[in-house]
Amino acid sequence: MDKEKAEVSPEEESAPASAEDLAAQKREARLRKFRELHLKTNEARKLNHQEVVEEDKRQKLPSNWEARKARLEWELKNEEKKRECAANGVDFERAKLLEISAEDAERWERKKKRKNPDLGFSDYAAAQLRQYQRLTKQIKPDMEEYEMEKEKQGELFYPTSDSLYHGTHVPSQSGIDRMVTDLEKQIEKREKYSRRRAYNDDADIDYINERNAKFNKKAERFYGKYTAEIKQNLERGTAV
């Protein structure tokens, strides 16, 4: 029996050892792959959490936040360009025009026309709204005065329900002068468009006052062709 054991070859002795090594290598490979999958899972969970947090932040922002952000960035860039032109002694408006190509200028004009097109007179409310939009676009805020007022008032510049700052602000003389000048321009322009016409004694009187006469003329200009037949029938007495 001892003789048979002594006659076992080295290959037969190394066979179980090599099988155990192979199994250990496979087990190590599986563990390594499991660890890699575990790391990837944790990384994916972390990225998903970050994305959820960012999405929650975006949902809490105002609906027009992206447009407002782009607008603020443009205004900041514009202010920096103004300061740079002022430091170099260059006219800002001229420098800005030099940077705009002919295609961009034409596209901008088309966009402005689409944004506030002149469709003619429809009613007084629409005309008043159009005038309001045009006047508000012409407002040029004085940012230097704004910053000075903010620095002067401190915390009162952002009043709360307990603040007494509201109603105490006194406009500057330059601001009052700008307002008066603008009102005078509006009155002058209005007078050009509302010149008093001479009355025609032979014309039919279908109005009760001057304003009603103007309204009737505008209504006739826009809707006269649709009501001509009705008027003729009424005059002949053949209207149903």
UniProtKB/Swiss-Prot annotation:
Location within or outside the cell: Nucleus
Q: Which residues form a coiled coil?
A: 63-91
Q: Is Cell membrane a UniProt keyword of this protein?
A: no
Q: Which UniProt keywords apply?
A: Coiled coil, mRNA processing, mRNA splicing, Nucleus, Spliceosome
Q: Which GO terms describe its cellular component?
A: catalytic step 2 spliceosome; nucleus; post-mRNA release spliceosomal complex; Prp19 complex; U2-type catalytic step 2 spliceosome
Region Disordered: list its residue ranges.
1-25
Q: Which cysteines are joined by disulfide bonds?
A: none
Q: Does the keyword Coiled coil apply?
A: yes
Q: What is its main location?
A: nucleus
One Gene Ontology biological process: mRNA splicing, via spliceosome
**According to the lineage, what is the superkingdom?**
Eukaryota
* Similarity comment: family membership: Belongs to the SYF2 family.
* Role played: Involved in pre-mRNA splicing as component of the spliceosome.
Subunit details? Identified in the spliceosome C complex.
| PANTHER family recorded | GCIP-INTERACTING PROTEIN P29, PRE-MRNA-SPLICING FACTOR SYF2
The name this protein goes by in its record: Pre-mRNA-splicing factor syf2
